[in-house]
Amino acid sequence: MRHRKSGRQLNRNSSHRQAMFRNMASSLVRHEIIKTTVAKAKELRRVVEPLITLAKSDSVANRRLAFARTRDAEVVGKLFTELGPRYQERPGGYTRILKCGLRAGDKAPMAYIELVGRPEAAQAVDVEAAE
């Protein structure tokens, strides 16, 4: 029985899942919008939202925590210099999921996950092609 077990397995072992969400979180912070499956997008929210909340208060300890979770210095810099100040007054809900139909190969439901209030110039990056 899987009572009280949170999170999705996504047919991966735990280290693969952790690496995948670490990479997807870095891509989302870097590009501010990515295209992925609906299930991965919903699970990615649980990774990215706490990172942005952490970035709202800039300190060395918080930067080290963010680096431990993303392992990307460029992403940590953007989190604390751009995204933290941008969402200073917003109490959560930093991401938006927009469903965009089915994938051509296997009919998997696809979605864009984007940061709310992003500049309109940012273009979507297809995460499936990057993997």
Swiss-Prot record:
Official protein name in the record: Large ribosomal subunit protein bL17
Recorded GO MF terms: structural constituent of ribosome
GO cellular component assignments: cytosolic large ribosomal subunit
HAMAP family for the chain: Ribosomal_bL17
Transmembrane segments: none
Entry annotated with the keyword Iron: no
Top-level taxonomy: Bacteria, Pseudomonadati, Pseudomonadota, Gammaproteobacteria, Alteromonadales
One GO term of the biological process aspect: translation
Description of how the protein assembles with itself and partners: Part of the 50S ribosomal subunit. Contacts protein L32.
Keywords: Ribonucleoprotein, Ribosomal protein
Top-rank taxon, per record: Bacteria
A Pfam cross-reference name: Ribosomal_L17
SUPFAM superfamilies listed in its UniProt record: Prokaryotic ribosomal protein L17
Protein family per UniProt: Belongs to the bacterial ribosomal protein bL17 family.
